[in-house]
Amino acid sequence: MAELTLFHYALSPFSEKIRAMLGYSELSWLSVTVREMPPRPVLEALAGGYRKVPVAQRGADIFCDTRTIASEIARLSGKPELALENQPEEVQAFVRKADLDIFLACVIAASDGRMLRRLIRETSLINTFRFLKDRINMGRKARVKAVRGAEAKRKVLDHIADLENRLSQDFLFGPTPCIADFSAYHGLWFVCDLAGKPWLENAPRVSAWMARMKAFGHGSPREITPEDAIAMAASATPEPLEPGAESGTPVTIAPSDYGRDPVSGSLVYSDDTKTVISRSSPKTGLLHLHFPKQGFRVVEQTA
């Protein structure tokens, strides 16, 4: 069975969510480090220009959005608690809020001089300006309500207080972690660890929980090149789909919140939780791109 390949960069919160899951699941995995913003030629080739990071690959199957990546990790590792669709509605509602409203509040609350200096230090001054311009342009096209700095801080502090109240056990919904823990973790990792906000000082349960989450580590990834990843895709064929395949209608699919660059392909599978489209090129051969159903808009293309 092919190993999972993760396309990510160090400062990406959602990449940290998946890296922590990989540490918890104890899966071996391959790593391809990509730029903080487009152009990303390897993802243009494999994911049709899908612009959010991380993206995962296993052979000729490409997984876009952390929900489909998490479901694949759950399947490969035999840890069903990592798949959102396996959770009760209470957990699913928590994850939806943590992955959008709380995440955006964490990013805005973290955006100060310290975070800017860190970005410059880990990339370059010119790359930082390009990154900021890219994120400003992405924000202008977003369909989510932006919050200001003070409101973002209040949201994050309220979130921390909620976690403090929830943590009567080692993890948010019981004695062992589930997808909710990883969804809550990555935003606080960004605002408290990377940006250095001291907002966990009066939240001992959350601080201890964060330490437990960090202790999972990232496993032992092996770095490969973008060319290696493309070669693996070209030499593989997509995994067989479950019964219920679609007819191959030309479609575009795009996130409905932000980073809404559409990806085109042929619809080959759809159910209550995911959509799969096919794409093909001489460079990669036939690929199947997997997207979550929720939060994505599929538009049929007419001649």
Model regions and ranges:
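Generic structural signal for buried aliphatic residues
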Residues: 251-253
